[in-house]
Amino acid sequence: MATLESRLADMLKVPVEALGFQLWGIEYVQAGKHSILRVFIDGENGINIEDCANVSRQVSAVLDVEDPISTEYTLEVSSPGVDRPLFTAEQYAAYVGEDVKLQLTMPVAGSRNLKGAITQVDGQMLSLNVNGKELVVALDNIRKGNIIAKF
């Protein structure tokens, strides 16, 4: 069965793209009785607040009709930012050589939190150089992954 995030991504991809943006990813965070639905969008020329407002109105209209979430939630629409979250194999592959921070569901090499450089993405497997040691992580074991911004 598909996760809520993947069902929402399927539902919202076309409306977001119709406005000229890419649906970068979706996070659904339950926080007690109230939850947060984060929709990340990207565009060729970046994203501004007006873009987020326009996408928010469109996404809100779709969610009102489809009603995929039965509890109260807050909708947030934003750009992925400099420490952008990564959701798909294609996104990880686009950042080979970059440093990432991963939170895992199951430990790899004794840890659920890893920081290292992406060395390769092969199908649904991610290779990561962590302190000179090559680790392989299944993408479905990644609970959350973010680029580590360099300043």
Curated annotation (Swiss-Prot):
An individual GO BP term: ribosomal small subunit assembly
Subcellular location: Cytoplasm
InterPro entries for the chain: Ribosome_maturation_RimP, RimP_C, RimP_C_sf, RimP_N, RimP_N_sf
CDD domains registered for this protein in UniProt: YlxS_C
Top-rank taxon: Bacteria
Entry-linked Pfam families: DUF150_C, RimP_N
Major localization listed first in the record, in broad terms: cytoplasm
Family matches, as PANTHER family: RIBOSOME MATURATION FACTOR RIMP
Family, per entry: Belongs to the RimP family.
Name of the protein this chain belongs to: Ribosome maturation factor RimP
Species, as recorded: Shewanella sp. (strain ANA-3)
